[in-house]
Amino acid sequence: MDAKRTPPPPTPPNPNPSVIGSGAAADGGGFGRGEAAAATKHMLAFHFLRALSRIHRATPVTRRTRTIRRAAYSSMARAASPRRAWSRALLGQVRARRSRTLMRRAAVLVRRRVVAAPAPSPASARGVRIIAAGETSAAARAVPPPPRQQGEPPRAEALRRLVPGGAGMEYSSLLEETADYLRSLRAQVQLMQGLVDLFSYQ
């Protein structure tokens, strides 16, 4: 009597769609591209729903709207390939925003301690100056737009302003980044529309 063979465990979903896309390019088939698009949509939905779950119901509507918009862009960047300049730029904005939030909270704590204490210590005063200097130096490091490259159409500057991370990018790379950014935007809009339809039926 033959022994029963244990079936192999199922292959887990690939969180990096670029790996699937590279395999599809090697096989030369369109099915791999469909798998890559499906994996990207799954990762997009995962990151977006996880970000939405962190929003409190007691948050004001205006702040909640701003948080949802930021969650949409953040989930797009996390689901995209890390080789894309626009995804790295969006994630950099998320990290910078988080750093500014932590700095503001630290400044509030320092001010509370200064008000509570009759005589503020020199270390606390230095902390306040360091935070203020950091914010000023970050604003002073704003990079001016690069000069227009020879032979490129006038719409290139508009694309550089619209696509995150497009500043200083040559025109051929800018077109590639724009196409990938628009694909991610379309997937994000479809996801949000699906969520609206789902909750409207309930």
Swiss-Prot record:
Highly expressed in roots and at lower levels in leaf blades, leaf sheaths, lamina joint, stems and panicles. Induction: Repressed by epibrassinolide. InterPro entries: IBH1-like. One of its GO terms (biological process) is regulation of DNA-templated transcription. Residues 136-185 form the bHLH domain. The keyword DNA repair does not apply. Disulfide bonds: none annotated. Residues 1-33 are annotated as: Disordered. Residues 1-16 have a biased composition (Pro residues). Keywords: Brassinosteroid signaling pathway, Growth regulation, Transcription, Transcription regulation. The keyword Transcription applies. It comes from the Eukaryota. Atypical and probable non DNA-binding bHLH transcription factor that acts as a negative regulator of cell elongation and plant development. Binds the transcription factor ILI1 and forms a heterodimer of antagonistic bHLH transcription factors that function downstream of BZR1 to mediate brassinosteroid regulation of cell elongation and lamina inclination. Plants over-expressing IBH1 show erect leaves with reduced angles of inclination. Interacts with ILI1. Binds to ILI5/BUL1 and BC1. Interacts with BCL1 and BCL2. Belongs to the bHLH protein family. This is Transcription factor IBH1. It comes from Oryza sativa subsp. japonica.
